[in-house]
Amino acid sequence: RFKQSQIKAAFSVNSEMLQFYWSLGEDLVKLKAESKWGDGVIKSVSQDLQRQLPEVKGFSVTNIGYMKRFYLLYSQIDSIYPQVGGELYLIPWGHHKYIIDKFSSEPQKALFYVRKTIQNKWSRAVLLNFIDTDLYEREGKAVSNFDEALPMPQSDLAQEMTKDPYN
């Protein structure tokens, strides 16, 4: 039970941290929209946070830039599908950074890899492998007539079964 509690606590901390990163990213986007500030905003925020919270890591200029990109990428989806927000907080920040690097202008692909990571409990190495081997494209290529031949729930299930992530 102790290990279970530790795992739950780690997930809770991760979720809270990601929610903070989301809100900071949102604040940065709003600050930039309301002012004439450029990249100096991120540097200034980074320095302020490091000065106020010297014991906390993760407030480098690079990481704060990722927070802004995190918000920009997923806010496109969140405005259409608000329930997605909760999913975003279920995977580690390091996973998000790789997804952001690869799909900063492709929110649907980014969300696909977030969901696959959650469903399959992928490590960062496994996630990178599936990104590098373009799982998103491969899973969409299974050709069938299941939609015409089977009723709705069965056609979806049959289609899913033909998709091979290792192909």
PLM segments and residue spans:
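Basic, low-complexity intrinsically disordered segments
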Residues: R1-N167
